[in-house]
Amino acid sequence: MAFDLKTEDGLITYLTKHLSLDVDTSGVKRLSGGFVNVTWRIKLNAPYQGHTSIILKHAQPHMSTDEDFKIGVERSVYEYQAIKLMMANREVLGGVDGIVSVPEGLNYDLENNALIMQDVGKMKTLLDYVTAKPPLATDIARLVGTEIGGFVARLHNIGRERRDDPEFKFFSGNIVGRTTSDQLYQTIIPNAAKYGVDDPLLPTVVKDLVDDVMHSEETLVMADLWSGNILLQLEEGNPSKLQKIYILDWELCKYGPASLDLGYFLGDCYLISRFQDEQVGTTMRQAYLQSYARTSKHSINYAKVTAGIAAHIVMWTDFMQWGSEEERINFVKKGVAAFHDARGNNDNGEITSTLLKESSTA
């Protein structure tokens, strides 16, 4: 039976009648944020799988900000299986004592596109902290970069090693994850044009990026690793103490190029450094890259990572709308220049040379 999980009444009916949960109706709240899901926090009078507060994500078939940007609702099953996989392989997260974690997956209902998971509590995203005044402390930024870089390297290591295991091979079939990346890459040319950049290399760049993400089986990638999908738990009364890092939104998790996770997070760091706080963004980028290089069992393809960073810059500079129009124009031009460096394997290019220098100090 299908329920309307976009409304509070429909949600409560679903939880009480379909799942037989004892819901505290005064503790039901729709959460803001998120581009493609309706998300609720629900307080319970009696525990569900040991939890008295849960999160329910109801998948929508399009972006909340753009109904023409379609995205299959079956993506939620991949998120559910991804967070279950991470909890079953805690060494990827850094072990039981590690500070990197994911919410516990509790239930997935295919008919209603409903994913229920652990409520990890009310905390701010990394994006919230890097855009705050004053911004995140540099020491915390360094620790965040180090921890996430190590986590991603371990994810890529195990993804390569266990590619043929059924529970890993499953993610090769995340067609929505692949096509969503394709749709994002298709924004590169119009985004560049919006800032007056019409470069004949861009169609070739987009084709190469799309071909790679649609067909690569290199390793397991999180594929949506940016500051808006990372929660930080700081010690109460002691904001200089980082207790936990939660990685959210695993819907796009799939087999693909390792450079996707590197380019996405490092590209986000470049945006933060340019438009928010240079020291925080740079520190986090360096720590991430160095930690990844130390932990990864495979060498980094710097040309592909440079292209990934360039793609992130061109795709997201306009979306974030940080800085002035002139600053955004210059930054998009920097991204396009990086495409040329990646294409020509130019180790002396601004971004590529920085990556080589910083990772060599690992």
Curated annotation (Swiss-Prot):
Catalytic activity, as annotated: 4-hydroxytryptamine + ATP = norbaeocystin + ADP + H(+); psilocin + ATP = psilocybin + ADP + H(+); 4-hydroxy-N,N,N-trimethyltryptamine + ATP = aeruginascin + ADP + H(+)
Family per record: Belongs to the methylthioribose kinase family.
Annotated positions binding ATP: N37, K57, Q118, D119, V120, D249, W250, E251
Pathway: Secondary metabolite biosynthesis
Name of the protein in question: 4-hydroxytryptamine kinase
Annotated thermal dependence: Optimum temperature is 40 degrees Celsius.
Keyword Transferase annotated: yes
Uses in biotechnology: The pharmaceutical interesting psilocybin as a treatment option against depression and anxiety is being investigated in advanced clinical trials.
Class of enzymatic activity (EC top level): transferase
Cofactor requirement: Mg(2+)
Function: 4-hydroxytryptamine kinase; part of the gene cluster that mediates the biosynthesis of psilocybin, a psychotropic tryptamine-derived natural product. The first step in the pathway is the decarboxylation of L-tryptophan to tryptamine by the decarboxylase psiD. 4-hydroxy-L-tryptophan is accepted as substrate by psiD as well. The cytochrome P450 monooxygenase psiH then converts tryptamine to 4-hydroxytryptamine. The kinase psiK catalyzes the 4-O-phosphorylation step by converting 4-hydroxytryptamine into norbaeocystin.
Superkingdom of the organism of origin: Eukaryota
InterPro entries: Aminoglycoside_PTrfase, CHK_kinase-like, Kinase-like_dom_sf
Gene: psiK
Record-linked SMART domains: CHK
Any one GO MF annotation of this record: ATP binding
Pfam family, one: APH
Species of provenance: Psilocybe cubensis
Assembly, per entry: Monomer.
Keywords: ATP-binding, Kinase, Magnesium, Nucleotide-binding, Transferase
pH profile of the protein: Optimum pH is 7.0.
GO BP terms, alphabetized: psilocybin biosynthetic process
EC code: 2.7.1.-, 2.7.1.222
